């Protein structure tokens, strides 16, 4: 019986963390790809030596050749330049678009049946471009943003309410950027919606508004503190949750950047919405009723993503 194969494109901080998580969870054998010679090989060797201590038998291989991703069941793409202080996600557009082109062509030639998760920023534009360059079905290419943004929102809410993060369920829609939409009315503690908790005196609207804003700039807060790069532990953990739902056919409801063709009034665009991920990839897009303010915020987010796509088409005419 063939073992499951997970290919990680990009052997930076997120790629290395993904490799460790995938191996330690025994999700499958891991191929770590990078264009820089020696880096993926060194990280794979280092990580494989965790096996005897942690007790995993997953094989790890580092490579600079796309041929080695052949037959991958899941591909997680982190290749590209990370944000530095003062950079917006959109500043990365030109550099990372070129990276997506080579990655997309590598996937198309070697692993056209894979389920692909993109993490590269600016996320909503890069996942769209990666899908275009790879030619894979839309339901097999998604972007990791909402799981991470929702986790950040949940972390801050758990701190505010002094409750376990396990009992906090949050919902973040829209683009992965300053226009994201944390939906307060669908976020709960043990099933109790946040607006009800405000009425119960657990918090105030002003404090929740501040948490929403902190969630929006959650990535930037970490970039400013690290000064040399961006978040990698939580992004990797979030992508692994998505991969696991696909590989184990768990059918988890997760917010992801998914391709919309009419849902939420959006067409031909990747935007963060709740989806069901199972063995067929994105099996269903969950359309929830939004308040007028959430709808308006989502539209702002959609418009921001559209602007990025116009810029992408301006940089690479093959996308037009």
UniProtKB/Swiss-Prot annotation:
Here the disulfide bonds are none
Residues that bind NAD(+), according to the entry? 10-15, 34, 96, 119-121
Top-level taxon in the UniProt lineage: Bacteria
Q: Which reaction does it catalyse?
A: (S)-malate + NAD(+) = oxaloacetate + NADH + H(+)
Q: Name one GO molecular function term.
A: L-malate dehydrogenase (NAD+) activity
UniProt xrefs under Pfam families:
Ldh_1_C, Ldh_1_N
Name the UniProt key words of this record, in alphabetical order.
NAD, Oxidoreductase, Tricarboxylic acid cycle
UniProt key word Oxidoreductase: yes
Which residues are substrate-binding? 83, 89, 121, 152
Job of this protein = Catalyzes the reversible oxidation of malate to oxaloacetate.
**What family, per the record?**
Belongs to the LDH/MDH superfamily. MDH type 3 family.
Q: What is this protein called?
A: Malate dehydrogenase
Give the originating organism: Rhizorhabdus wittichii (strain DSM 6014 / CCUG 31198 / JCM 15750 / NBRC 105917 / EY 4224 / RW1) (Sphingomonas wittichii)
């Amino acid at each position: 019986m063939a073992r499951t194969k997970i290919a990680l494109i990009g052997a930076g901080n997120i790629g290395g963390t993904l490799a460790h998580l995938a191996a330690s969870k025994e999700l499958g054998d891991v191929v770590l790809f990078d264009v820089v010679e020696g880096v993926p090989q060194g990280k794979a060797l280092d990580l494989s030596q965790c096996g005897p201590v942690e007790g995993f038998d997953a094989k790890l291989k580092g490579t600079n050749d796309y041929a080695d991703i052949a037959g991958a069941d899941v591909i997680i793409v982190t290749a590209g330049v990370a944000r530095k202080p003062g950079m917006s996600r959109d500043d990365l557009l030109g550099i990372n678009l070129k990276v997506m082109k080579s990655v997309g062509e590598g996937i198309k030639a070697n692993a056209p049946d894979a389920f692909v998760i993109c993490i590269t920023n600016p996320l909503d534009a890069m996942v769209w471009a990666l899908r275009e360059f790879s030619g894979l079905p839309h339901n097999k290419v998604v972007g990791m943003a909402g799981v991470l943004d929702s986790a950040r929102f949940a972390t801050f809410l758990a701190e505010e309410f002094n409750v376990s993060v396990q009992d906090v369920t949050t919902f973040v829609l829209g683009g992965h950027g300053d226009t994201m939409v944390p939906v307060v009315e669908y976020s709960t503690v043990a099933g109790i919606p946040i607006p009800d908790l405000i009425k119960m005196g657990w918090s105030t609207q002003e404090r929740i508004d501040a948490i929403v804003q902190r969630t929006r700039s959650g990535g930037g807060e970490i970039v400013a503190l690290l000064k040399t790069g961006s978040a990698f532990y939580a992004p990797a953990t979030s992508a692994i949750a998505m991969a696991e739902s696909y590989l184990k056919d768990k059918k988890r409801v997760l917010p992801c950047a998914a391709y919309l063709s009419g849902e939420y009034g959006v067409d031909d665009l990747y935007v963060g919405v709740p989806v069901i991920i199972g063995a067929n990839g994105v099996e269903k897009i969950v359309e929830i009723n939004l308040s007028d303010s959430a709808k308006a915020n989502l539209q702002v987010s959609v418009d921001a993503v559209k602007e990025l796509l116009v810029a992408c088409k301006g940089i690479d005419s093959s996308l037009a």
